[in-house]
A protein has these predicted regions:
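Hydrophobic alpha-helical transmembrane segments
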Residues: 19-23, 62, 99-104, 139-143, ...
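Alpha-helical transmembrane segments in multi-pass membrane proteins
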Residues: 20-81
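Juxtamembrane helix-loop-helix connectors linking adjacent transmembrane helices
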Residues: 43-63, 80-149, 167, 236, ...
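Alpha-helical transmembrane segments of multipass membrane proteins
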Residues: 28-37, 67-75, 109-114, 178, ...
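Hydrophobic core segments of transmembrane alpha-helices in multi-pass, intramembrane catalytic enzymes
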Residues: 67-72, 141-145, 199-204
C-alpha cells in the first residue's frame, strides 16, 4: 500500500493486462500487415513477391493505422467492459486548459534534441528512411506520426504501462523502464544504432516525466504531437514540400 501512496498511481488493471495488451498490439500489427500484403498481391501487384509487397512503406503505415485503431478499441473494452470504469478517468486523460503550451514544449524538445544529435554517431542510412522515397509515403508517415502514433503510444506507455510500474517499483524506476520500452520499440526503424535510440530514450524520459508530473496522458500526447510534428515540418521544409525527397539523403 505504501508504494501506491508514494507514486499516486493505482490503476484498475494489472501487469498481466499490460503484457497481454502488448501481445495483442504486436499480433494485430502482424496480422494486418500479412492480410494487406496478401490482398495487395491478389488485387494490385500480381508480379511482385509476397516479401517485396510486405516491405512497402505505404502498406506498412496503413496496416499499422488499422492495427492501432483495433488496439484502441481493445483498450476501451478492457477498461469499460472488463473493469467497469470510465475510460478517460481510468487512464487519467485530463485534457489541459493551456494545451498549446505542451505542443510548443514538444517542438522545443525536438529542436533541442536535433542539436544534441549532432554530437552523436547517427547513421546516414536507417530503415525509417525508406518511408521517404515518395511523397505519398512521406505524407502517410507524417499524418500517422501526428495522429494515431502519439495517441496509441502514449496510451500504452504512459496510460497503461507507467502506472502499473509506478505502483510496483516507484516513480523513478517506472519512468526509466517506461522510457526504455519506448526506445526499444523504435529501435528497428532506427537500425538499432545507439545514437538515435538514445535520443528516443530521452524523448521517452521527457514524455513519462510529463505524465508523472501532470497526472495527464493528454499532456504527453500533445508533447508527442509537437515533437513529431516539428520533425516532420523540418523534413517538409528541407525537401520543398516532399517534392524533392532526394535532398534528405544528402
Amino acid at each position: 500500500m505504501s508504494r501506491v501512496n508514494r507514486s499516486g498511481e493505482n490503476p484498475v488493471w494489472t501487469g498481466w493486462d499490460v503484457a497481454l495488451l502488448a501481445l495483442v498490439t504486436l499480433g494485430t500489427i502482424l496480422f494486418c500487415i500479412l492480410f494487406l500484403t496478401f490482398a495487395a498481391q491478389k488485387l494490385l501487384f500480381h508480379n511482385l513477391s509476397f516479401a517485396d509487397i510486405g516491405k512497402m512503406p505505404l502498406l506498412s503505415v496503413i496496416a499499422q493505422g488499422i492495427a492501432y485503431t483495433a488496439v484502441l478499441i481493445y483498450m476501451i473494452v478492457l477498461v469499460v467492459a472488463v473493469y467497469h470504469q470510465n475510460f478517460e478517468s481510468a487512464v487519467r486523460w485530463n485534457w489541459p486548459r493551456r494545451w498549446p503550451i505542451f505542443i510548443a514544449g514538444g517542438a522545443l524538445l525536438a529542436m533541442a534534441l536535433q542539436g544534441f544529435a549532432h554530437f552523436l554517431p547517427i547513421p546516414t542510412d536507417m530503415p525509417i528512411d525508406e518511408f521517404f522515397n515518395t511523397p505519398a509515403e512521406a505524407w502517410s508517415l507524417t499524418i500517422f506520426g501526428v495522429t494515431l502514433a502519439p495517441l496509441i503510444e502514449e496510451l500504452f506507455f504512459r496510460g497503461f504501462l507507467y502506472p502499473v510500474l509506478a505502483r510496483r517499483l516507484g516513480v523513478v524506476l517506472a519512468i526509466i523502464l517506461t522510457a526504455a520500452g519506448f526506445g526499444l520499440i523504435h529501435g528497428p526503424q532506427l537500425g538499432r544504432a545507439w545514437g538515435p535510440v538514445l535520443v528516443i530514450f530521452i524523448v521517452g524520459i521527457a514524455l513519462t516525466v510529463t505524465r508523472a508530473v501532470t497526472k495527464s496522458v493528454a499532456t504527453g500526447i500533445l508533447v508527442h504531437i509537437g515533437y513529431n510534428g516539428t520533425l516532420s515540418a523540418l523534413l517538409f521544409w528541407a525537401s520543398d514540400g516532399f517534392r524533392h525527397l532526394e535532398r534528405l539523403r544528402t
